[in-house]
Amino acid sequence: MAVFHDEVEIEDFQYDEDSETYFCPCPCGDNFSITKEELENGEGVAMCPGCSLIIKVIYDKDQFACGETVPVPSVNKE
């Protein structure tokens, strides 16, 4: 059984259109991430590649089943 660091609503994530990935800051300084495809497949766990923390993503599964994207601010990564 997974132990979640936190539960975060998808609206609190930043969305990168190029990679179709949602990002949320992790306490370690890296970012939790989950792809649009993972959400469409019903997966609701975002992982941080910089540490072992995972978070539960709160989102409307019906919204992603239709291939829709939740409008959130884009992140310009430079």
UniProtKB/Swiss-Prot annotation:
Name by which UniProt lists this protein: Putative DPH3 homolog B
The species this protein was found in: Homo sapiens (Human)
SUPFAM superfamilies reported for this sequence: CSL zinc finger
Coiled-coil intervals: none
Domain of life: Eukaryota
Entry domain remark: The DPH-type metal-binding (MB) domain can bind either zinc or iron ions.
Family label: Belongs to the DPH3 family.
Keyword match Transcription: no
Keyword Metal-binding: yes
Cited InterPro entries: DPH3/4-like, DPH_MB_dom, DPH_MB_sf
Binding residues annotated for Zn(2+), in chain numbering: C26, C28, C48, C51
Gene designation: DPH3P1
Keywords carried by this UniProt record: Iron, Metal-binding, Zinc
GO MF, one annotated term: metal ion binding
UniProt cross-references to Pfam families, sorted A to Z: Zn_ribbon_CSL
